[in-house]
Amino acid sequence: MRKYLYSENGFTEKAEWQPNCWVNVECPDNDDFKFLTEELKVPESFLEDIADVDERPRTETEDNWLLTILRIPMQSNQRGVPFITVPIGIITNDGIIVSVCYHHTELIPDFIQHTRRKNIVVNNKLDLILRIIYSSAVWFLKYLKQINNDVATAEKELEKSIRN
């Protein structure tokens, strides 16, 4: 799924791509892949790196392109593993900003809503990258709080069972 977002008192979605917009691609399909590689000329190697579930956070440059890979938290559907991290790639050059994640997460939609609620204007690609890193940190803390609550509950239950 591909969205074109423009920063005007928060991100607003538009119908088509224009220079200096943010293209957010979530769970890309063949049409998205074709758009990114053929129309925007995004290096295929970047998209392949982002698809690797074990990819580590890093930056890489190729020609005029910059790839920034982050690991963002998301809820897991695996039993006994409440949360996992997945890679998201932010690919930029002079007039193009693209984020690609091969998983549906709550982070990006929440980030977009936050910019709208607070009327945040993102002026450049580095500002966007830093704000996404900050948003990721907020989600890590949110999930850590849930884990701490689960641990506290388990400790109370264990203490109670030991007394009986």
What are these regions (language model features)?
Residues 1-164:
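Peripheral, non-transmembrane regulatory/ligand-interaction domains of membrane transport proteins
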